[in-house]
Amino acid sequence: MAGTVDAYRQRVRPGEYRTTIPKNKDRPMIQGSQIHSSLTMLIEYYETRAEIERTQILEFHVRFEQIHPFDDGNGRVGRLIMFKECLRHDIMPFILDDKRRSRYLQGIREWFIDRYELVDVVMEAQSRFESQIELQKLQKSAEFYQPEEYKEGLKNEDE
């Protein structure tokens, strides 16, 4: 039955490119038949860059989102690719939380006019991620460097 969840599930093919143009999108979408060639060109362009920095990763992400290759999960896949590329190029990775979702989406929409919003929200996310890593390092080093007398005292309190 058209318009039902079951109809949607039958149309969505995880891991395969979409074959239709998604409805309710606020931007023009490429045809399903153009997805493979568009992704190939995007990847080739990205991989031939002399240097990959945060801005190039974000531009790749925005263009990936414009291609919108799948029926569902494009944002999750795109953000996972960004995380992987940050690690690959020794850039502090980041996780975009729900609190910043609207700014992230606005930044994608405005990318070719003004890159500030997306770069800013990502820099905030990188800073938070780096702080979390540093906090974990401090906690681990505090556990590692505790004097033996202190550790013994903790054991005695537990008994």
Feature locations, PLM:
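FIC/Doc superfamily catalytic core
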Residues: 1-159
